[in-house]
A protein has these predicted regions:
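Non-catalytic interface/targeting segments
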Residues: 1-49, 108-120
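Mid-chain, well-packed structural core segment of small domains
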Residues: 59-94
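C-terminal structural segments of small proteins and small subunits
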Residues: 86, 90-118
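Short active-site-adjacent helix-start/loop capping segments
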Residues: 42-44, 73-76, 101-102
């Protein structure tokens, strides 16, 4: 089997997640985060229009946003989903653990992805 190393240069993979935060590119970030082509932004849960504003502003660089709602899956409010979809951004809601894994896979595939991650 041939192994190929994947380079995520210039991207922001989630190295790990744990109690109260995330390790992004080797640095611990406490709290809930928005990861986008424009960088890392913190926010206070729950996910609201203010947390999603940086994504809408970058809609031309994002095809899909993964929303990690914490330890359990919780629906995203319809007006928030509609605002993202109106901006041309697809939305997938899942647990934070699933969102972290899926985000990293999509980054490795060089997809135009962002993530909203509620800390667990």
């Amino acid at each position: 089997m041939r192994m190929t190393e994947i380079s995520l240069a210039g991207r922001l993979p989630v190295d790990s997640y744990g109690p109260g935060g995330f390790r992004i590119e080797g640095a611990w970030q406490a709290g809930s985060l928005v990861l986008s082509p424009g960088g890392v932004h913190g926010f206070e849960p729950p996910v609201d229009a203010e947390a999603l504003a940086p994504l809408v502003a970058q809609a031309d660089a994002i095809d899909v946003v993964l929303i990690g709602q914490g330890a359990e899956i919780a629906p995203l409010a319809a007006p928030l989903r509609e605002a993202l979809e109106a901006a041309g951004i697809g939305v997938e809601v899942m647990s934070t653990a699933s969102a972290c894994r899926t985000y990293n896979v999509l980054l490795a595939e060089d997809r135009r992805v962002a993530a909203v991650l509620v800390a667990v």
